[in-house]
């Protein structure tokens, strides 16, 4: 009721209330709500089958949302299968994994970046990330990338030898991200739950 009341609160709360209504409509939609099209697949003309077809829900987020506490909300949505796929930036992937390896700290927007940098600390808004966090991330990621390259090369070698059934194999960004989610083994992670629940993550940037 609180969220719905925003629609009549005024200012930007109104658009938030409208967004709540749109999310409700998106989650409630079924193909059975729509008239049957002339070119509809035969199996989708069955009312029972149409009632089972839901909207495919994409969630898009930028890296700053993962750097901040919003990460926990995004993780919850994937853990409980509230979305069908996630679209994020490279920073969104990196920040999620880095938080599994070492904590970020609360700071202040007024802290001087140059002074922090001299101490080996990076600032994201009012969040502080020690250089060590990036080192830990690199140490964790590099062996996995080497392993993935070995898998691709092994597949290419089998093809070159003409082995029966051999096919070239390449990691797509989504399959790389899924492997990271499988390897991180941390229930606080967005990538962990995406991999566990087979929810694809697309990273065009």
Residues of each region from the PLM?
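Conserved catalytic alpha/beta core of Sir2/sirtuin-type deacylases, generalized to analogous enzyme cores
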Residues: 1-205
